[in-house]
């Protein structure tokens, strides 16, 4: 009996009469499930296939002629070929255009009939779609290339036309503005994020432009727009913005007398307008909220005018006093406020040739005795604190010493004072004529030496180079010593440390004349005007005819510095310093001075000198002096003129002005002292100007229009020394060491036992100053003084300035 499953009851249990077969039932169930799943998968696959087929059909069936832009991009090379063909056609290159159209598969009739719109043609089975070509006279490709190349040159800094440069600048400006906008937007977003993180953000809308204007200080509306205009218009502070921050910190000092020192007034709320904060406030009144300070380097002073003592406001209260500096810590504000007589702490940096040779000379017993006898007492002077004075033995007055101290970088305002001081020295009595009676000339008194302050070792030697001048001396014609200075190029490796110009002073006092010593020291007590590189200044002297010269170069070391701080003994022919004799000076040994002060000859030569043998002195200026002023004080008894009187043409014709001033000089005691001699002026004959002087009974008339004359035979009390009218020396004739001793200009009283060999001589000293003599461009002038009836003792002092 077979079992037949009912279709309506698939899960029915068969009757018990038929046996149950489990395996068969299981197979039937699996087959049913498989059929169901297969049908579902087939259904899904069919749907997917249908969708794919639909998409493919849509892509295939989509019309390509409707989207022209996409077609141009897909056919970009065809478009370029079209413009190339158009350019070749309009450039009259027909053969080239035909060959190019054939190779590029283009329609040859296209160049003749420009296409107005897209068309499709079939050529050899290939579909070629042509886009519209812009019609231009020379071809669109050519014009496009011109614009492109112009802008490319402008952007690459290779030139370009003016229009291209303007266009490029506009493009750059737009790019910069966009960059600013983007940076401000990022900054505003960061501020908003910080405010939200701190819980201070209330959905405000921050405009980046307003924020940028507020940060730049421009007056604009607040950057934060308020939601309700009726609420309190106080902006919400944001920590990220440093300008909007408001910290309620009390000020350092509140100098408000009405509210008190401890009261703090409320400050105005911050806003975007910052124009009325600083400039409109009164600086003479205290501003609440601004700290009040004083400069720590300035003392507190009461200022009734109301000028501010600091950068904020004036401190007029007593509860805020800054510490006051002690007077020793106060500094000079300007260099011109320094007085002229203030001594400087720096000593001289220069050392003469004789002082450098101190360590090489062994001081013997004789040198020690001379140093013991010749030591002068140095005392601080009252007229010039920068240079001490020398007290000569036997004299109660002090003389200015040649010390090493100098004023560095003399201000421009002090030059006039220095000129006036020099004018007083050149115009009035000799500064060394105020000493009282000295011992007689028979008693041997040593010459005063100059004590020098110890110098400091300096490491910096980059100064002006020293010029070396070898001097050759020779005795000619019975004692006529002619010395010429030869210039030698200075070495580049050695640099001089001296910048001041020394003076050479001969026969300055009685003791020097007595011992036949030649001593050098400064001729003025004012600071040296050559300490700093001077400039051309106007003449400040009371004499309009005097020309001090134009200082065009920095002062260099004078070759006369080798004689500085030493004494010359004409008897022994040696230079003696503080430590004894230094070196011998004779005709074979050259000295480093261009000024030849010849040694007095002995024996017959001295007798010839005493018997009025004419002498000649050739003076050459130092190397490097652009304008040289020569100051000579002659103590000659009598000056005889020579035959060829030549005077430089650079001497001004201002003799009448000087004559009127000198003629009214109250210091003169004679009627014919102030007569000027200007009739001997002639044109110069050569570069070396020779200056010869007339034979004058009264030497005071020995003046040129630009020379300063000063009477040196008077005391500071305007009392004439009558004893100076006589000669101060005797000539025995048989003594080789006997010299012609002119009278001293320091007021020495002569005894009755001293008789004069020349009774007709007038022994008044002459102070001559030659300014701008013999100046030739690019040539150093030489001064040839043909002096007759004079010797080396007639030169009181010779000073180079320039």
UniProtKB/Swiss-Prot annotation:
- Gene Ontology BP terms: regulation of biosynthetic process
Localization of this protein: Nucleus
**Which is one Gene Ontology cellular component term of this protein?**
nucleus
For bias kind Polar residues, which ranges apply?
1-10, 28-40, 273-288, 321-343, 374-399, 587-596, 663-678, 698-757
| Domain of life per record | Eukaryota
Q: Where is this region: Disordered?
A: 1-20, 28-71, 104-130, 258-409, 434-506, 566-625, 647-757
Where it mainly occurs, coarsely classed, is nucleus
Q: Where is the LisH domain?
A: 76-108
Amino acid composition bias (Low complexity), ranges on this chain: 41-58, 310-320, 344-356
* Cross-referenced PROSITE patterns: LISH
Q: Which UniProt keywords apply?
A: Activator, Nucleus, Transcription, Transcription regulation
| UniProt biased composition (Basic residues) | 357-373, 485-500
Q: Which family does it belong to?
A: Belongs to the FLO8 family.
Query: What's this protein's function?
Result: Required for diploid filamentous growth, haploid invasive growth and flocculation. Putative transcriptional activator of FLO1.
- PANTHER family assigned: LISH DOMAIN-CONTAINING PROTEIN, TRANSCRIPTION ACTIVATOR MSS11
Record-given protein name: Transcriptional activator FLO8
**Organism (species):** Saccharomyces cerevisiae (strain JAY291) (Baker's yeast)
Q: Which gene encodes it?
A: FLO8
